[in-house]
């Protein structure tokens, strides 16, 4: 299991709180590197000050990590990673799963739902309707 390192951001008020579920089932961690200390908004409500250098924040849900990643992009911080941590301590990188963000080109990434034709070459939907095929398979 990968060990995560970094400083926890400074909380000025409410942290938004971790759910008890995070200790019993699973929790999520997001790590990022900041060029300077700056205030950011937490996805659970409230605000915190990120430390200069490596930061580590534990969250109760993956969606909070994705939302915080969007906040970090406003600060031109794009090296964030989101991990799932199981109660046994097992750590798994979940975003970006293959090391490259989804909107970037990755030579090894397989195309998903790719159909090699232009939109004008699509078959007539009425010809497919009762044929048993799906429109995305035709």
From Swiss-Prot:
Record's keyword terms, sorted: Photosynthesis, Photosystem I
Top-level division of the source organism's lineage: Bacteria
Pfam families tied to this protein: PsaD
Cystine connections: none
InterPro entries, per database record: PsaD (IPR003685), PsaD_sf (IPR036579)
GO-annotated biological processes: photosynthesis
Record family assignment: Belongs to the PsaD family.
Stated role: PsaD can form complexes with ferredoxin and ferredoxin-oxidoreductase in photosystem I (PS I) reaction center.
Protein name: Photosystem I reaction center subunit II
Source organism (scientific name): Microchaete diplosiphon
């Amino acid at each position: 299991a990968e060990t995560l390192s970094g400083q926890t951001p400074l909380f000025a008020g409410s942290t938004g709180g971790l759910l008890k579920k995070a200790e019993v089932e699973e929790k999520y961690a997001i790590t990022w590197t900041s060029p300077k200390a700056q205030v950011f908004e937490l996805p659970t409500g409230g605000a915190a000050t990120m430390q200069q250098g490596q930061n580590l924040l534990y969250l109760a849900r993956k969606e909070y990590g994705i939302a915080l990643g969007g906040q970090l992009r406003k600060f031109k911080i794009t090296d964030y990673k989101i991990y799932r941590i199981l109660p046994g301590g097992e750590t798994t990188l979940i975003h970006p799963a293959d090391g490259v963000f989804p909107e970037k080109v990755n030579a090894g990434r397989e195309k998903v739902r790719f159909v090699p034709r232009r939109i004008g070459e699509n078959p007539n939907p009425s010809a497919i309707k009762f044929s048993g095929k799906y429109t995305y398979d035709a």
